[in-house]
Amino acid sequence: MAPAEILNGKEISAQIRARLKNQVTQLKEQVPGFTPRLAILQVGNRDDSNLYINVKLKAAEEIGIKATHIKLPRTTTESEVMKYITSLNEDSTVHGFLVQLPLDSENSINTEEVINAIAPEKDVDGLTSINAGKLARGDLNDCFIPCTPKGCLELIKETGVPIAGRHAVVVGRSKIVGAPMHDLLLWNNATVTTCHSKTAHLDEEVNKGDILVVATGQPEMVKGEWIKPGAIVIDCGINYVPDDKKPNGRKVVGDVAYDEAKERASFITPVPGGVGPMTVAMLMQSTVESAKRFLEKFKPGKWMIQYNNLNLKTPVPSDIDISRSCKPKPIGKLAREIGLLSEEVELYGETKAKVLLSALERLKHRPDGKYVVVTGITPTPLGEGKSTTTIGLVQALGAHLYQNVFACVRQPSQGPTFGIKGGAAGGGYSQVIPMEEFNLHLTGDIHAITAANNLVAAAIDARIFHELTQTDKALFNRLVPSVNGVRRFSDIQIRRLKRLGIEKTDPTTLTDEEINRFARLDIDPETITWQRVLDTNDRFLRKITIGQAPTEKGHTRTAQFDISVASEIMAVLALTTSLEDMRERLGKMVVASSKKGEPVSAEDLGVSGALTVLMKDAIKPNLMQTLEGTPVFVHAGPFANIAHGNSSIIADRIALKLVGPEGFVVTEAGFGADIGMEKFFNIKCRYSGLCPHVVVLVATVRALKMHGGGPTVTAGLPLPKAYIQENLELVEKGFSNLKKQIENARMFGIPVVVAVNAFKTDTESELDLISRLSREHGAFDAVKCTHWAEGGKGALALAQAVQRAAQAPSSFQLLYDLKLPVEDKIRIIAQKIYGADDIELLPEAQHKAEVYTKQGFGNLPICMAKTHLSLSHNPEQKGVPTGFILPIRDIRASVGAGFLYPLVGTMSTMPGLPTRPCFYDIDLDPETEQVNGLF
């Protein structure tokens, strides 16, 4: 019989690698910027592992695969290995990775646990139990096969001998070679016998094999005489045996007696140069295959997200019943779906999470998505559905048009939840869920703001007290105490010295005059603007006297409590752009003036660092979801009158990066367009540097009827007949307000889409009239919306209009230059946005404008605090009032947040409870822990 034909693994693997190189080149041409990527994780420094890894790295480089070698020290623990595996699992740029075995660590590491932690879709070594199970079941197209058996199969196929119907014998049953080889041959239709160390009459079993694969690790165990004449012999062994003829005294042999076997076999692999090169080639092939699978599923920039189907009911159930009827997906799953890494997410149970700012750093080079702001016409006291429209729009864009989309909304105050307003999370089939989580503590951000705010308040009164009761020297000694005989200034004290122009760092060198300036803030109690806060509606805290305890030695003063969301710290949170920026803004907050008229800041009080510590978690946006499973950031909830009424810049920026250039971020501005939208543009966008693409202007038939002269609308009372019967004349008259708000939006150079939020009492004629008039007067489009009753389906036309508008030309511009005098900036807003003839600065406002300008705050943007129920200062004036002078009663400063807020009327910053508060209906089921009674 002629000697066996040699199956040259080097030559065959070279051909495979050449094909792979061509495939990689084609992939890169098809998807510019795309490169298949392999990662190899090694623990320790074994010489044999280093050798194998170098061979793999070289092969990857030759083919065009980007290979990364992660080498961990021998001191590495199992948990540390697991962290790296988790990171590689979540890294979408890594298409395959392997853990080099054995793990060379001083610590005990469970290899099986480590291997099975690898995501099966990235397990290019094919060693996880999932891939092994799929191989055993014959799912060859849905698993990765261990590289050595896969290479053996390629060598067998190279012979041209059909596998089907042949009797194959596998000697060895290891998880890496023998067992998967058995499965692979079986599902290629061979009849397979597996032999092992306990097999009786091994020579007889081997002699039955038309195909023989040997992987025992025993040098030349299988003798030539065992081989069936004409068999295909695949030898996986690499063994070192003594050989005096070799320079190093040893030679490499396989598990088969090669010289004997080649005389009986028809095909045989040499050792070395047979199976070994094929193993590396198969690793490369699996990596390229994984990259291809990734591209098949992956549409550039598209999330692979699972949406929830709504079970729509008529009549529409209560908000809380709808919220409970839809089971939210685990928030960790949603985070993964939208491209967040596990180390960027802090889970707060199953339905809410915080997102770390490191996500923004990771994605900083990704282009932003389309930026949409939802606002409204001047509303009725009932509200016109901006929040519901925001949620309905994102559900339509995401669950129905399959766009990457994020909603960014404000966190509601807990006070109104128990007061008169009830819950706020959208409504009907357009909600953020779970509703009770959204409306109650959420992740504690407002509690953190309350704690931080009240720390400042406590610091103010404590400082006044201590300065009144101590000499300069005693005060200085307590502010800069001697520790172990040494006095040192803290960092915050050194910064205060520099602001005072005292360039000294040694406390012992200060003069008496410098000690006086440093130690005394000399706060004028009459100028204190900082109030204590509480997230509860409590009317009896609107004016209080503090300091009545005997220990305060008669140092009393009149003060008040505000609702927590009225705190400047909430506005700081909403406008900050980074942790560093927040630290700076908190320090800049002006709490009072000194008796010399100089501003006193939180930094002067020495409290700004502590405030940052209290706020370090609150700065992270809160991730929740809509009923239909689209992501929502709930973050910050500043007042829309004395503050700017918008959710946080940080949430918007992270969301814009996550959705990518083709996606959408939809955020909501408080109150009507004359207030919330104007502040969104002139304050929020000015600080964020973000450029909006579309304004969605929400209008309702009932609001237009009110502006057209309809009867007064009162919350809690039935609507008058004029609002539930068709009246086209009232609608057309009231369109004047919507027309003005369209003009206001277009003043900033942004396309406007009018969303006509339909109610069951509206007629088609009324809805069509609003849409037609809107388009005639400058709206890009105007569409009827039924998202309250139908969820995303009811906002589909709106979503399509927003998509078109986002592609339309725009030229975003701000309304005024910050360098203008304070009075001129106020006048521009009053005349252009409200339609006032002029403004009148009353004496207190005139004085404050001069003081703030002198203190260096004149270049801040303006945040108008006026009624939201009219374009004018008079809430009774509907439509578009004309011929009025806007009175400015006072001007106050939120220096840390970064704006001045003129007061047009009196503003309540602490709501009260009504006769029958919402809490009458709120309770907890002790068995299910279900919250009952929220709207």
Swiss-Prot record:
Pathway: One-carbon metabolism; tetrahydrofolate interconversion. Its main location: cytoplasm. The active site is at residue 56. Changing residue 49 to A: No effect on methylenetetrahydrofolate dehydrogenase (NADP+) activity. No effect on methenyltetrahydrofolate cyclohydrolase activity. Decreased affinity for NADP. Changing residue 147 to Q: Reduced methylenetetrahydrofolate dehydrogenase (NADP+) activity by 50%. Reduced methenyltetrahydrofolate cyclohydrolase activity by 87%. SUPFAM superfamilies: Aminoacid dehydrogenase-like, N-terminal domain, NAD(P)-binding Rossmann-fold domains, P-loop containing nucleoside triphosphate hydrolases. It catalyses: (6R)-5,10-methylene-5,6,7,8-tetrahydrofolate + NADP(+) = (6R)-5,10-methenyltetrahydrofolate + NADPH; (6R)-5,10-methenyltetrahydrofolate + H2O = (6R)-10-formyltetrahydrofolate + H(+); (6S)-5,6,7,8-tetrahydrofolate + formate + ATP = (6R)-10-formyltetrahydrofolate + ADP + phosphate. Residues 310-935 are annotated as: Formyltetrahydrofolate synthetase domain. Substrate binds at residues 52-56, 99-101, 272-276. Ubiquitous. The modification N-acetylmethionine is found at residue 1. It comes from the Eukaryota. Homodimer. This is C-1-tetrahydrofolate synthase, cytoplasmic.
